[in-house]
C-alpha cells in the first residue's frame, strides 16, 4: 500500500533484504572482519549489543560472505534449546542423524567437524543467535 505511494521497489526493513542491498557502515564492516578472523583461527567469539544494532544482520552477512570452499556455517536461533537438541540441530545441518543421547551426539558433532576439516579442509562455524535467552543448563 505505502510502497506504491512512496514509489518503493520493495517493502523496506524486512529480514529478507538481499545481502548486497544491506547498508554496511564502517562499524558493521569491522565487526564482520573480526568475526571472519575468529573463523579463520578456529576461535570462540561472543557478539553482544543493544536490540536493533545489527547483530543478526552481521551474522546474515557473514553467512553469505564466508567462502563456502573453506567454511560451513551452522545457524541456530532457538531460545528453548536443550543440550541434546543443540547437538541434534547442528548434526541435522551436517546431514547426520543424531543420537538422542547427549554425550554420544556431542562426540558425533566433534567427529563430523574434525572429518570436514581433515578431509575437505572445511572449518565448521557454529552460530547461536539470541543466545541470551538460553537456559542455564544450555550455557553450561
List where the protein language model places each region:
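Short glycine-/polar-rich loops that comprise or flank the Walker A/P-loop
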Residues: 42-43, 68-72, 122-123, 140
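Residues at the beta-strand->loop junction immediately N-terminal to the Walker
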Residues: 48, 77, 128
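Walker A/P-loop nucleotide-binding motif
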Residues: 41-61
Amino acid at each position: 500500500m505505502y510502497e506504491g505511494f512512496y514509489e518503493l521497489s520493495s517493502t523496506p526493513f524486512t529480514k529478507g533484504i538481499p545481502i548486497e542491498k544491506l547498508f554496511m557502515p564502517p562499524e558493521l564492516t569491522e565487526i564482520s572482519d573480526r568475526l571472519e578472523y575468529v573463523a579463520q583461527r578456529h576461535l570462540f567469539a561472543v557478539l553482544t549489543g543493544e536490540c536493533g544494532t545489527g547483530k543478526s544482520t552481521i551474522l546474515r552477512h557473514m553467512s553469505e560472505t564466508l567462502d563456502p570452499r573453506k567454511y560451513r556455517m551452522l545457524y541456530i536461533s532457538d531460545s528453548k534449546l536443550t543440550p541434546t537438541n543443540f547437538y541434534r540441530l547442528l548434526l541435522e545441518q551436517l546431514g547426520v542423524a543424531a543420537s538422542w543421547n547427549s554425550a554420544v551426539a556431542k562426540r558425533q558433532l566433534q567427529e563430523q567437524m574434525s572429518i570436514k576439516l581433515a578431509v575437505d579442509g572445511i572449518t565448521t562455524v557454529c552460530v547461536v543467535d539470541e543466545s541470551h535467552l538460553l537456559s542455564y543448563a544450555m550455557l553450561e
